[in-house]
Amino acid sequence: MFDETMRQPPDGEGSVQVEMDPALHIETAKVFAIYGKGGIGKSTTSSNLSAAFSKLGKRVVQIGCDPKHDSTFTLTKRLVPTVIDVLQAVHFHTEELRVEDFVYEGYNGVMCVEAGGPPAGTGCGGYVVGQTVKLLKEHHILEDADVVVFDVLGDVVCGGFATPLQHAERALVVAANDFDSIFAANRIAAAIQAKAKNYDVRLGGIIANRSVATDQIERFNARSGMRTLAHFPDLDVIRRSRLCKSTLFEMEPSPELAAVQQEYLRLAEALWEGVEPLTATPLIDREIFDLLGFD
């Protein structure tokens, strides 16, 4: 017979995710988890946000949670080895690892870590994220951090890739001003609300990205109770920064770039000061279609 703990999922309705080890709690830093539709620019957003925090004098750790391991590419100027790579190299004997084996200093002192992931179709990405946090704790990297940014794979919100939500105090959703990314943002918001029943994480809001206007996002916000925290337009300099292996703070100065840099600094300041948690009500799929899908 199942006991009571088996009958009552600890992590939201129907969840099978295990409860986080209390020893892995990130005590002192402000922790943010960045989600959004695949290809929407989460890594670019995360890296420039980390750079902005560092510009404010904060000690920042960015953790990439995607098997592509390109989250910190513009910060480090290269694809760094992943935690899963270095663990495999030492046959998972963590005592053989040094900090420099999996933590790399990037632009303006941002400490960069790529969790990586298991081979396609095998294992659980959440396990890899958990092992990454465990290693960082063992080597006291997180104790010295002011800010931790989790850059999370696509719009996957299964128990595994929702693992960063166990550590975060605010979850942010990157979305463009179009139906597909808003649809994904709504699903992500629903998953975050489910996690909020048992964890400290709360919705922070939407970061509008690659968008000239935000009218569709604002329509969604008005209906769901979400809000827009920042707006980054669809500029060629942002695309080129990725090709140049650079953050936006390293690109050739221009008036339009200066405006984007200031928006990142404003967002970092707002997040550091603390944004009020949202009590949004995600829409059902039909409501999204009715709201945005048929004009």
UniProtKB/Swiss-Prot annotation:
Q: Which CDD domains match?
A: Bchl-like
What does the record list as coiled-coil region(s)?
none
Residues binding [4Fe-4S] cluster are 124, 158
**SUPFAM superfamilies linked to this entry:** P-loop containing nucleoside triphosphate hydrolases
Q: Which PROSITE patterns match?
A: NIFH_FRXC_1, NIFH_FRXC_2, NIFH_FRXC_3
**Superkingdom:** Bacteria
Q: Which residues are noted in the entry as ATP-binding?
A: 39-44, 68, 209-210, 233-235
Q: Identify the cofactor(s).
A: [4Fe-4S] cluster
The record lists the catalysed reaction(s) as: chlorophyllide a + oxidized 2[4Fe-4S]-[ferredoxin] + 2 ADP + 2 phosphate = protochlorophyllide a + reduced 2[4Fe-4S]-[ferredoxin] + 2 ATP + 2 H2O
Classification via InterPro entries: NifH/chlL_CS, NifH/frxC, P-loop_NTPase, Protochlorophyllide_ATP-bd
- Does the record carry NAD as a key word? no
Question: Keyword annotations for this protein?
Answer: 4Fe-4S, ATP-binding, Bacteriochlorophyll biosynthesis, Chlorophyll biosynthesis, Iron, Iron-sulfur, Magnesium, Metal-binding, Nucleotide-binding, Oxidoreductase, Photosynthesis
State the EC number(s): 1.3.7.7
Query: Which sites bind Mg(2+)?
Result: 43
GO MF term (any one): oxidoreductase activity, acting on iron-sulfur proteins as donors
Could you tell me which Pfam families the record lists for this protein?
A: Fer4_NifH
Gene Ontology biological process terms in this record: light-independent bacteriochlorophyll biosynthetic process; photosynthesis, dark reaction
- Give the co-factor note: Binds 1 [4Fe-4S] cluster per dimer.
Q: In which pathway does it act?
A: Porphyrin-containing compound metabolism; bacteriochlorophyll biosynthesis (light-independent)
Provide the family line: Belongs to the NifH/BchL/ChlL family.
Task: Tell me how this protein assembles.
Answer: Homodimer. Protochlorophyllide reductase is composed of three subunits; BchL, BchN and BchB.
Q: What does this protein do?
A: Component of the dark-operative protochlorophyllide reductase (DPOR) that uses Mg-ATP and reduced ferredoxin to reduce ring D of protochlorophyllide (Pchlide) to form chlorophyllide a (Chlide). This reaction is light-independent. The L component serves as a unique electron donor to the NB-component of the complex, and binds Mg-ATP.
Protein's name in the database = Light-independent protochlorophyllide reductase iron-sulfur ATP-binding protein
